[in-house]
């Protein structure tokens, strides 16, 4: 897994900004609820390992399509 849980809030917001997605849009793309994405961004919950894998697979697809560039520190 290449997403570090402690960098997650920064990471998930950066993904949404670059892809011009709302929390609801991102939730739909990765198969979770809006409330889940909202809780992640507000530091109420960290994603499960399964959710992290879903996010990584989605981000990998977007990177391959040239739609997403991530900072090296992630």
PLM segments and residue spans:
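Helix-turn-helix/homeodomain-like alpha-helical modules used for DNA recognition
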Residues: 72-74
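A short, Lys/Arg-rich alpha-helix, primarily the initiator
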Residues: 1-18, 56
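Short alpha-helical DNA-recognition segment
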Residues: 20-38
């Amino acid at each position: 897994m290449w997403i570090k849980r402690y960098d997650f809030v920064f990471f998930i917001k950066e993904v949404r900004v670059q892809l011009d997605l709302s929390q609801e849009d991102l939730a739909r793309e990765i198969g979770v609820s809006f409330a889940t994405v909202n809780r992640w961004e507000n530091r109420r919950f960290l994603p499960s390992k399964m959710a992290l894998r879903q996010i990584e697979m989605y981000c990998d697809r977007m990177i391959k399509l040239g739609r997403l560039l991530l900072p090296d520190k992630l």
